[in-house]
């Protein structure tokens, strides 16, 4: 199918399946591709901003001259995907190997590359204590931004938020989220926007 020149803003494509779809020149902003299958698709010249590829299967897809800005790659399949001329800027690339892909850049300076998610014990007891009750909020829990299965916390999100906020600030701001989050959201970029609102509330 043909999705050329499309503009996807804050979309949720979790667990969707696309095969042999042309997304040439499309723009993806604040979009979640969590556990999606995007196999043998053509993403040539696409621009991905604050988009999350979590456990995404990208086998055989073309990302020729694509731009990735503020994106997250965690796990997933890049077999035979072609990244010729693609650029990555301020992205987090976690537990992803480009070895089975074609033309995946060797030099990823200006990005954060990690072999695995940060360990659970990198999160302070105080912070864990405010994150855990937020599971009761359906919007927050379903977003997967703070909580993972088996009672675990999304340590990557916390690491990213700590570039903006101190531990104490997060302990203060996170409990304000249930009042502010009134719609379903899917990405860390959206969570950051909610925290900005929480900051204003806290100042008031």
What are these model-predicted stretches?
Residues 134-204:
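Charged, low-complexity intrinsically disordered regulatory/assembly segments
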């Amino acid at each position: 199918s043909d999705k050329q020149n499309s503009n996807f803003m804050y979309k949720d494509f979790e667990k969707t399946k696309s095969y042999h779809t042309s997304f040439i020149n499309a723009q993806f902003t604040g979009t979640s591709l969590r556990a999606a299958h995007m196999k043998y698709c053509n993403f040539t010249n696409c621009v991905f901003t604050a988009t999350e590829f979590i456990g995404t299967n990208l086998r055989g897809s073309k990302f020729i001259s694509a731009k990735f800005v503020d994106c997250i790659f965690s796990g997933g399949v890049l077999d035979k995907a072609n990244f010729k001329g693609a650029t990555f800027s301020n992205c987090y690339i976690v537990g992803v190997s480009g070895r089975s892909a074609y033309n995946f850049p060797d030099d990823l300076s200006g990005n954060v590359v990690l072999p695995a998610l940060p360990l659970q014990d990198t999160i302070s007891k105080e912070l864990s204590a405010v994150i855990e009750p937020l599971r009761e909020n359906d919007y927050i829990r379903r977003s997967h931004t703070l909580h993972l299965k088996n009672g675990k916390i999304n340590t990557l999100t916390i690491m990213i938020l700590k570039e903006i906020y101190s531990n104490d600030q997060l302990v203060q701001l996170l409990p304000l989220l249930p009042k502010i989050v009134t719609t379903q959201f899917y990405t860390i970029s959206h969570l950051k926007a909610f925290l900005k609102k929480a900051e204003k509330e806290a100042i008031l």
